[in-house]
């Protein structure tokens, strides 16, 4: 059942990605984008059911690194829909849909190549840790998407001869910068608290808070970069290209920690 639900979600994300591309290139972007958003909504529901079933039937799966990619994709969709509900920015899904497809595809490829860890390390503290960390990374994933659109649109505006390539329904630079600001304000505290629960879980599982494991070191690096973005936005009031690039860097390091470290 879990594999079937994952495959259905994967297909819907792929279909949504295709529809968004058609919507951008076509003459009726609004109607096509609505269909794409419906596909992502169904995918989100399927992933929600998948996570609930897996939590009830087999908690061991939550300690597999490849499995992390599925709740991360779920978090990305959740954050994207929250932003869509509050700000009505449909363009943010253009980045989220293909990214979720890549995450789900990677999870399905690598899921059966890992063995679960001891049952003793699985528990509520781990669930809280993963939930908050994924929420923080998911928020930054959406901010990274907004950052890509910000830098791309700014480049087109600087080269006025390319303005014809600018889609009519893309959010303004100010709107994209606002997404970045919201991400820094709420994402950093969530990630920081999630990391604290991670160290508590490590102490409960292995008897030490910090073991200089590469995963722990890069998590602190992500926290430092995330904190720097938070400082730049909330304390110094920085905006524009710098914070857009920072969001991309934070998310890139987070993806490196998941796929490589």
Regions found by a protein language model. Give the residues of each.
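Hydrophobic cores of alpha-helical transmembrane segments in multi-pass integral membrane proteins
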Residues: 2-114, 132-155, 175-205, 211-261
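Active-site glycine-rich loop that binds ribose-phosphate moieties when present
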Residues: 118-134
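Membrane-helix interfacial "entry" motifs
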Residues: 122, 126, 171-174, 178
């Amino acid at each position: 059942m879990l594999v079937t639900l994952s495959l259905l979600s994967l297909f819907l994300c792929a279909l949504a990605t295709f529809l968004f591309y058609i919507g951008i290139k076509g003459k009726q972007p609004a109607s096509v984008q609505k269909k794409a958003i419906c596909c992502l909504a169904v995918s989100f529901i399927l992933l929600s059911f998948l996570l609930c079933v897996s939590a009830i039937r087999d908690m061991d799966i939550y300690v597999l690194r490849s499995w992390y990619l599925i709740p991360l994709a779920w978090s990305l969709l959740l954050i994207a829909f929250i932003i869509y509900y509050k700000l009505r920015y449909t363009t943010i899904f253009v980045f989220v849909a293909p990214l979720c497809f890549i995450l789900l595809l990677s999870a399905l490829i690598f899921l059966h190549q890992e063995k679960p860890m001891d049952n003793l390390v699985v528990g509520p503290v781990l669930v809280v840790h993963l939930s908050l960390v994924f929420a923080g990374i998911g928020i930054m994933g959406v901010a990274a998407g907004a950052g890509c659109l910000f830098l791309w649109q700014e480049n087109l505006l600087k080269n006025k001869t390319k303005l014809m390539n600018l889609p009519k329904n893309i959010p303004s630079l100010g709107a994209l910068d606002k997404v970045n600001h919201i991400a820094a304000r709420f994402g950093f505290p969530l990630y920081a608290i999630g990391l604290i629960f991670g160290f508590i879980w490590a102490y409960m599982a292995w008897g030490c808070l910090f073991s200089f494991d590469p995963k722990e070191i890069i998590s602190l690096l992500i926290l430092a970069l995330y904190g720097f973005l938070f400082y730049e936005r909330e304390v110094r009031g920085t905006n524009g290209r710098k914070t857009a690039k920072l969001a991309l860097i934070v998310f890139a390091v987070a993806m490196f920690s998941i796929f490589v470290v």
